[in-house]
């Protein structure tokens, strides 16, 4: 057996897996971020101990624990900073292993780990080389080459949400710079584009009925119904993302792009909007990359964490 753990800013998702990759049980605990997140690892250990007791499984039968975290992780398991958890710099693999009776621990960045999950058991399982793009509140990414996470020199590989895509942008991204991909293709980015269209044009669109409360889902739903304004927003978003993918493709030449995160619930409609622009802008040798939806949903991080141990 092994544990796959996905630590988010509000909840920790835990999964007990067979080493063959079957999810046997999954559950959640609250992420206690107070006091610089000092309780998070002990809460995880308690949750794992309780599950072993409940299932009658000995710790000797556990191959290890994989853990995905919201921040850059170096190749030796050092967390550089997890702002969402209140953590500074320390070696999370050593610390968790020490707390959980010396068990093997592997840690990775959450977006990279989710990509590994999709590559192992999800939308990318037919491929060795994939790029996963997660469109949520922000935009995350993960690059899998020959079945392994490409982390780069100090864990920064795959941070595609912060690719610079627009010189004319005046709003700042969360990272402090202007013109990042995340500002145009995340759920918040789609809403921003919609509000900009409503505020700066007289275009007739049902988006106006939602006013300030419009969501990315509303935009995609209206676009599917043929609303011209919503379609313009989706087309703009697809142009930014498809073009960014063509830039990524000439560097890593993946067999497939896997699109996940909340925005991907728009389904094939979203894929079509991206794919056309990707094909139009990418170098010919990279043009046949498949573009698929992720299939593991919120469980991708758990699967990927388990894959770091079992795969």
Q: What residue spans do the PLM features occupy?
A:
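Gly/Ser/Thr-rich active-site cleft segment
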Residues: 64-91
């Amino acid at each position: 057996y092994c544990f796959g753990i996905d630590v988010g800013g509000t909840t920790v998702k835990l999964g007990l897996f067979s080493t063959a990759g079957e999810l046997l049980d999954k559950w959640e605990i609250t992420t206690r971020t107070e006091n610089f997140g000092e309780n998070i690892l002990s809460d995880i250990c308690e949750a794992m101990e309780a599950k072993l007791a409940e299932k009658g499984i000995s710790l000797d039968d556990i191959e290890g624990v994989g853990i995905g975290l919201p921040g850059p992780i170096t190749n030796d398991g050092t967390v550089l900073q997890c702002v969402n958890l209140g953590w500074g710099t320390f070696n999370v693999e050593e610390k968790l292993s020490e707390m959980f009776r010396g068990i093997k621990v592997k840690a990775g960045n959450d977006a990279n780990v989710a990509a590994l999950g999709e590559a192992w058991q999800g939308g990318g399982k037919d491929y060795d080389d994939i790029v996963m793009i997660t469109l949520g509140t922000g935009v995350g990414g993960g690059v899998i080459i020959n079945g392994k996470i490409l982390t780069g020199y100090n864990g920064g590989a795959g941070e595609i949400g912060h690719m610079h895509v627009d010189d004319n942008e005046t709003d700042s991204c969360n990272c402090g710079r202007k013109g990042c991909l995340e500002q145009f293709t995340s759920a918040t980015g789609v809403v921003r584009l919609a509000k900009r269209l409503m505020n700066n044009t007289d275009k007739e669109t049902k988006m106006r009925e939602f006013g300030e409360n419009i969501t990315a889902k509303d935009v995609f739903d209206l676009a599917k119904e043929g609303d011209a304004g919503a379609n313009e927003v989706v087309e703009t978003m697809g142009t930014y993302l498809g073009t960014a993918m063509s830039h990524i493709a000439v560097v890593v030449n993946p067999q497939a792009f896997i699109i996940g995160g909340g925005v991907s619930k728009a389904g094939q409609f979203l894929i079509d909007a991206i794919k056309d622009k990707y094909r139009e802008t990418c170098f010919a040798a990279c043009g046949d990359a498949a573009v698929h939806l992720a299939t593991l949903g919120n469980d991708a991080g758990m699967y990927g964490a388990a894959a770091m141990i079992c795969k």
